């Protein structure tokens, strides 16, 4: 995710796999580099790549990764029901498993518009599949969201920065409808790009 992390990885790579370097013509430094994030050290990344390329005489590749779509889209869902099972769980018309796989497979908890660090009302967000673990942010160990006011059936829940996985890695698990893709223009106009229906399943 960061240039300093890449530097650490490359040092370990050189130490453990240095014997293979003379046979290499190129190296892929992978994806996941958040180069479009405001606090990303782009200058350090450039130095790392130049130094490696010049030292070993190899071509260096970076995969585009989610930086291409960083902060470019959100996932809008609605509360279908609210149940209590030791904790309040808002059941959504979206699914962590089918629409936000990074929130199930990785220690990642997406931000939700309107959440409040000191809010009095705490919820977990459950998906609309039959999967027991279809809970947003469960793998991150922080699956609870706080709000200043109670959620109600029909309320919208907007997950920030979700386009990078919601569009490219979603599934129709359990026959769950894929999210529609809309474009929000700078003037506020909303344009339907693709509406997905049961035929897609």
Regions of interest found by a model, annotated:
Residues 48, 59-201:
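Charged (often Lys/Glu-rich) extended helix/loop segments that serve as interaction or gating elements
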Residues 1-84, 174:
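Active-site loop/helix belt of alpha/beta enzymes
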């Amino acid at each position: 995710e960061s240039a300093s992390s890449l530097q650490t990885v490359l040092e370990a790579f050189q130490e453990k796999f240095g014997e293979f370097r003379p046979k290499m013509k190129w190296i892929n430094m992978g994806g996941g580099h958040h180069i479009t994030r405001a606090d990303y050290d782009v200058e350090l990344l450039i130095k790392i790549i130049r130094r490696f390329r010049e030292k070993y005489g190899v071509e260096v590749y970076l995969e585009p990764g989610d930086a291409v779509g960083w902060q470019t889209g959100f996932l809008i869902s609605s509360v279908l029901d609210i149940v209590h099972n030791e904790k309040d769980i808002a059941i959504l018309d979206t699914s962590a498993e089918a629409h936000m796989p990074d929130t199930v497979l990785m220690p990642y908890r997406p931000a939700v518009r309107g959440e409040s660090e000191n809010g009095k009302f705490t919820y977990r967000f459950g998906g609309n599949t039959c999967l027991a673990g279809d809970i947003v942010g469960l793998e991150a160990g922080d699956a609870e969201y706080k709000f200043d006011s109670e959620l109600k059936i029909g309320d919208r829940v907007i997950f920030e920065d979700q386009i990078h996985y919601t569009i490219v890695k979603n599934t129709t698990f359990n026959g769950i409808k894929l999210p529609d893709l809309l474009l929000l223009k700078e003037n506020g106009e909303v344009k339907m790009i693709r509406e997905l229906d049961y035929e897609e399943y």
